[in-house]
Amino acid sequence: MDKLSIRDLSLEGKKVLVRVDFNVPIKDGKILDDVRIRSAMPTIHYLLKQDAAVILVSHLGRPKGGVFEEAYSLAPIVPVLEGYLGHHVPLSPDCIGEVARQAVAQLSPGRVLLLENVRFHKGEEHPDEDPSFAIELAAYADFYVNDAFGTSHRKHASVYRVPQLFPDRAAAGFLMEKELEFLGQHLLVEPKRPFTAILGGAKMSSKIGVIEALLSCVDHLVLAGGMGYTFLRAINRQVGNSLVEESGIPLAKKVLEKAQALGVKIHLPVDAKVAKQCDSGEDWRELSIQEGIPEGLAGFDIGAQTIELFSKVIQESATIFWNGPVGVYEVPPFDQGSKAIAQCLASHSSAVTVVGGGDAAAVVALAGCASQISHVSTGGGASLEFLEKSSLPGTEILSPAQS
């Protein structure tokens, strides 16, 4: 990696501002999955071992900005952090202002301070409207470390503006290094072949850039989930009331033409679990795509024949990247297709298997097979943008590696 690493920093007695991604799922004040917190621990432990004072910065959810909202407070993070660290972690009630400055001033080397959600301030997501927000955050520390891969595709203040205020002192954390090196080496530089990408999720338009980029490097492209129905419409299949982006049909046709020209094999669903609606998971049946889905019914998951087809493609591949569920996995039985993909990846131990964060990572966790996947990324949108552009705003802006 050509960026400054925390290994290169002289940290003893210094204050370090660490951008982490603690955007974890929370219900009734309890964290449902703490993998993003666990993933940041190697960096935090290293900094503490070097006798640095660690100031953690994160967002959580999508608050309105400009006001405190208890539902998006980082307070539930504190007991989990304390459990991993074995000591008290104070939470500053704000990330800027006098209360935050005092909390930082009182922070001793070898200890950790968590600042409250940066998105409570509009200057985080709209740094041009309030440049002073980044300046206040940067004033706390001697060094800046970005360990928030999952947020580094956004040009937000704590990810993009703050590191610019640390010339030659803005470094990548261990999680960031791991993500960039694994994704770069195994998917961009030297993927073992055949290389298959599986893309699901609702919208095709949000992934058109990465689809076009992948066409130049993959051998097989599996398209399913909501976006799969847009592609099926592009080849004149009847999909009933299934989710279709009408404006995306011409784009889908161009993708199919380009794939054919490049010799990339496209795989689309051949059957689907359909129902009038998906909220209850009842009154469903499987229908062949060839026969068509009638009006009044919609596809909410891939069917048994498609699971068999996609599994065969996976088993014959040496590298597989998966982003986006292939069905409405939150509602059984429409979770069966996504879980089958997860289990097939997990059982293919000789392949390099990469799950690109987000909902696909959630499915792998639900299926109980995350430990059998080569790499489960902490970034959904970030992993896609990295594959599309080979870099991210939050990593580009870090200081260059020391020669």
Curated annotation (Swiss-Prot):
It holds the Pfam family PGK. Its main location: cytoplasm. Substrate binds at residues 21-23, 36, 59-62, 119, 154. The keyword DNA-binding does not apply. Its EC number is 2.7.2.3. InterPro entries: Phosphoglycerate_kinase, Phosphoglycerate_kinase_CS, Phosphoglycerate_kinase_N, Phosphoglycerate_kinase_sf. Keywords: ATP-binding, Cytoplasm, Glycolysis, Kinase, Nucleotide-binding, Transferase. It comes from the Bacteria. It is found in: Cytoplasm. PROSITE patterns: PGLYCERATE_KINASE. GO terms for molecular function: ADP binding; ATP binding; phosphoglycerate kinase activity. It catalyses: (2R)-3-phosphoglycerate + ATP = (2R)-3-phospho-glyceroyl phosphate + ADP. Pathway: Carbohydrate degradation; glycolysis; pyruvate from D-glyceraldehyde 3-phosphate: step 2/5. Belongs to the phosphoglycerate kinase family. Monomer. This is Phosphoglycerate kinase. It comes from Chlamydia trachomatis serovar A (strain ATCC VR-571B / DSM 19440 / HAR-13).
